[in-house]
Amino acid sequence: MENIAYYNGKISSIEEMTIPMNERSSYFGDGVYDAMFTVDHVPLQLDDHLRRFYRSAKKIDIDIPMPFEELRAMVLDFCRRIDSPDAMAYVQATRGVGMRGHAYRFAGGTPSLWVWVKPDMLDPMDRSYKAITMEDTRYFHCDIKTINLLPAVIYTQRAEEAGCDETILHRGDRVTECAHSNAVSYTHLRAH
């Protein structure tokens, strides 16, 4: 087979796999992933990648719905089943499927697990590479409404756990915004 995919108990080709519209990864980027290359149908550093995957999930309160050894066996099996000996193996866990809402309680309670393997090759080690440099501003773009809202999900959950409605975010002494609301400050109030 050319490629193979798994999503919450269903196995098919990547092209035939369907994901629900209310999967939290599409709303919020609410999940973690790891990826590894395979050479001769063997994933490189599989255990290291899977340990990091489980550790990442734990840090954002996602319980991966498959034990480590079972997931390891699935990845190995998928790598053997595809035609190409050189491939990319990918694993992803999300908070699951549920109606859109920042707090975890909207997630429906069951995390989702994705696995896929498709043909890919490592770039030759002796190849020349070109690069540019840019300042790392990945987390300074709260003015851009992307769907990568994992920090907002975490902040909203922490507010709920504290019995609060919202988390006000700041950089030093400057308020930037809230986890899922705008921040407005009235500094000069007058009674007329």
Predicted regions and their residues:
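Short beta-strand scaffold segments in enzyme catalytic cores
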Residues: T167-I168, N182-S185
